[in-house]
Structure formats: structure tokens, C-alpha cells
Amino acid sequence: MQVFVPYPSPIDVARAMSNDKLRLRKQILECDQILKAISGESKAWKNHPIVKMFLKHSSWLLFYRDCLQYFQEGDIAWAQDRSDYADELYRPPFLTDDFCDQHKRRLYTKSPTLYPQFASYGTSEENWYMVDGQIVKYINGKRI
């Protein structure tokens, strides 16, 4: 499971992914699964590092999901109208330049034709999660 955050702003992420309809749908679904695990509505994924990563940041994740949803539906104005809210929203501390750059590499690796703007970041097979203040790296579902 992966939530891509190539930018700290959910609006900027939605804008970057707006041409990748399949990825948008998948991200929305994965956000829903994470939010259900956080709320206790679902036991699935409750021990996954991404659930632990967003445990204290569910409001940010919900806004991220909503931005993707509205961009997918073509209602770009929804997110733009809430840009002030996005700026005030508590940003998870793990959304550093290095962390976001790694997500740019992952998106480019997955689909270079849809993410040519990330070509200069190179490629990577690693998924990064922040757990207990530490970056945890995985490749193909295995911690490295």
C-alpha cells in the first residue's frame, strides 16, 4: 500500500496526478483503507507502516483524499477554493524535501510517460514510510 506525496500540499499532489486517472482512483481507495484502519472501522492494514505513518495525521490524509477525489471528478475549483484551509492544515512533519523527492522518483519509475516532470529525480524501487520518527524503507513488500 502506498500514498504518493511528491509535494507537501495535497492540492499540488492532485494537480501533478491529474493526468493519471488510474493512479488517482487507486490513491483514493488506499486513503479510504488507511482511514478505516485508523478509525478502527477495519482491522485490515492496521499494522501496515503507512497506517502508523498517518495515525496522527488523519485530517491531512482526509483532505488529500478529498483533493484527489475532486480533481478526478474534474472539480478543480473545489480544491483551489480551499487553498487557504490547506495552508492552515497541520502538515505532517515527515513531508520533508527528501521524503517528497523519493515519491517523485517512485512515480517516475512507475510511469515515466505520465510523470516526465520528475525525470530529473531519477528512479527508485524503494517505498518510504515514516514510523516512530524514522524512515523505514521497503522494496517489493520487504523491509530493507
Show the residue positions of the predicted features.
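Expand to "…catalyze enediolate/carbanion chemistry for C-C bond making/breaking, isomerization
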Residues: 1-144
